[in-house]
Amino acid sequence: WSVDGVNFTRNATNPIFAPKAGDWNCGRAIDAEVIFAKGKYFLYYATRTPDYVKQIVGVATAPAGTNFNRETWTEACDRAILVPEWPWEETCIEAPSVVEMNGTLYMFYAGAYNNRPQQIGLATSTDGIHWRKVSNKPFLANGDPGAWNYCESGHPHIFKDKDGQTYLFYQGNEDFGRTWFLSQRKIIWRDGFPQLK
């Protein structure tokens, strides 16, 4: 936790959450993001199938007023909430980032591993647990040959500022990971749907 956003103190109960290894996951959690919505906290994370073949997304929840300690988080369901299914996603869904707009949750996620190329997809939910992918194509694709993001547009983070404007931050590179760049795109909302400006 931090009071100034610069200096942080580690939670004494770290790790505050680890999924229970079993039929659907290997017991690890990475790329975590927490959002408060629907009267509770959601912790979205990437994990892998028990055979470590596919990267998938899971979710845990904690009640409003939580101190974020380990004992407050519980797995919200006994399955992955998002899995790779389209050709461009290959065997990986990771780096979920969620924003709520007018009661609907929008998840921006990375599909495929770094430099495959990784691209950004979009899914929606009304309860934070059951998700539907918006399209079988990326929301934000990698760039053309020679572009700064030719090898990937990945690991998204959706950010809403105090004025309500949303921005999609993401990483990219053109040389298969030897150098990395960060960028952002402004998101505009039309008929309740995000679009790149």
Description of each model-found segment:
Residues W1-K197:
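Carbohydrate-active catalytic/glycan-binding domains of CAZyme proteins
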